[in-house]
Amino acid sequence: MKTNIETAQGWVAGESAATDPAMRVFRGLPYAQPPLGDLRWKPPQPVEPWTDLHAADAFSLPCWQTHSEDAFVWSRGVFERSEDCLYLNVWSPEDADHLPVMVWFHGGAHTGGWGHNLLFDGTNLAGLGVVLV
């Protein structure tokens, strides 16, 4: 089921988690402008607000990193990389008012870390009463 929320940048459309309909998931939310062109090798710049409903129902591509055959077991079949990779995912109970926010930084030693890793599905952890980023 789709779920829409308003952010400082505009409206975002997420969805219910496949394993828990009471859990909202927002995938591929931009947290900075893509570091491309004149922004390459510069500090991240704020995201420009949008006026249309932003679909947050798909993971973004991971950043470029060293290729590791072992890491691809957890890749969900995504083998592409992109410099346009400044996105995050959020798992949240439906009633998230006043819940603590937990930020998870995945590992991977720059050889196999990405937000869409099968091991990093945040549904269960958010179900314990946190908003997981």
Question: Can you name each region flagged by the protein language model?
Answer:
Residues 1-133:
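Non-catalytic accessory segments of hydrolases
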